[in-house]
């Protein structure tokens, strides 16, 4: 038994005629007849009764047809899936990201990315940067977005260097400034990132000598921005998180450069993935365009 014989059987069952089946398969009628005869010999079943110019499927043929049709539906599904994979519309994509991105830019971009990819299975994990690196290293994530040093063994890394911005409540005295200096923060309550993070250390180096009111310490950028929105204080923040709040707070450049960029992390081990390549390329384009539109990146 071979696939061509099964295809001939399916064509005859679909059309009900040898001639029509031959046209469907783009072969001659004698060729179809030979394939059906060989298929009957291979299965040791009489599949059709010949009555003049007509052929009538036997009960055995009808029973076999159910399985053959189911198999061809499966083959068609495989073909469609292969086509989807070829145009990056199917497969799996596992993303681990620090909360500043997992709660903001990434969901916005991801909704756009999957719109024309209905068969793409995606997982998005919001994790601390250290755990993002672990997820990529262990193979639990295909891509990671994290804060941290750029020199890391065993990873492929791409990054953007972005200046942190100052987030102030609407109507605040600093909202009228073109640029905020460390001295402008004197007497203000600063909402700062969790002590010990790389970004928090960078901020403290920049404003450490300024007299301020007691600070509020938070673990998430979005928490800091929500507090700014409610008038609780001022935050020096990464623009990737702040972009989600531009209609509710005021963002101003800071006079001292504080690197608020992030890393795109992929494992250096293993074969590249077309869908991952497409995602990362399109995400950086989306990110850069959005930052430029809002004056947060040159």
UniProtKB/Swiss-Prot annotation:
Residues 18-37 bind DNA. One of its GO terms (biological process) is positive regulation of gene expression. PROSITE patterns: HTH_LYSR. GO terms for molecular function: DNA-binding transcription factor activity; sequence-specific DNA binding. InterPro entries: LysR_subst-bd, OccR_PBP2, Tscrpt_reg_HTH_LysR, WH-like_DNA-bd_sf, WH_DNA-bd_sf. It comes from the Bacteria. The keyword DNA-binding applies. PANTHER family: TRANSCRIPTIONAL ACTIVATOR PROTEIN LYSR. Positive regulatory protein for the occ operon involved in octopine catabolism and uptake. Also acts as a negative regulator of its expression. This is Octopine catabolism/uptake operon regulatory protein OccR. The gene is occR.
